[in-house]
Amino acid sequence: MTNVFTIDAFREEVKKKYEPVTIGISEDVTVELKPLLKLGQKAREAVVEAVKEVEDIPDIDEDDEEAEELVDEYSLRICEIVAKVFRLIATKPKKLIAALDEEEDPRIRAELYATVLRTWMVETQLGEAAPSPS
């Protein structure tokens, strides 16, 4: 069985990398999240650093007596870090952050922040580089 690739399919994938991700805040307010490829070098580096910072937050041991306290602390930390990313990639970062901050529960708020970030990362994903011919 042979896989057939079309130029149109390639074109769609390539265009997707350059298109913003649109997040609806309300019926009449949307925020666009710029793709990584359209950011300047310093902004790209800051985004990558922030994502690494989130990934470096340690897992919480459920048996730890301070686990409940740590969950809230880590949740707030995640929101702070991801907000930095939104300030770099969003057309209206204050509106996006304000909408996410309406959630009072720090755990749910952190999950909302992470979901928006994850959606942006998936939708604008660069993918793996093709192996070089040898």
Swiss-Prot record:
It comes from Mycobacterium phage D29 (Mycobacteriophage D29). This is Tail assembly protein Gp24. Keywords: Viral release from host cell, Viral tail assembly. It comes from the Viruses. The keyword Aminoacyl-tRNA synthetase does not apply. InterPro entries: Gp24/Gp25 (IPR020132). Promotes tail assembly by creating a scaffold for the tail tube proteins. The tail assembly proteins Gp24 and Gp25 would wrap the linear tape measure protein to create a tail assembly scaffold. It would allow polymerization of tail tube protein during which Gp24 and Gp25 are released and therefore are absent from the mature virion. The tail assembly protein Gp25 is produced by a rare -1 ribosomal frameshift. The ratio Gp24/Gp25 is important for proper tail assembly. One of its GO terms (biological process) is viral tail assembly.
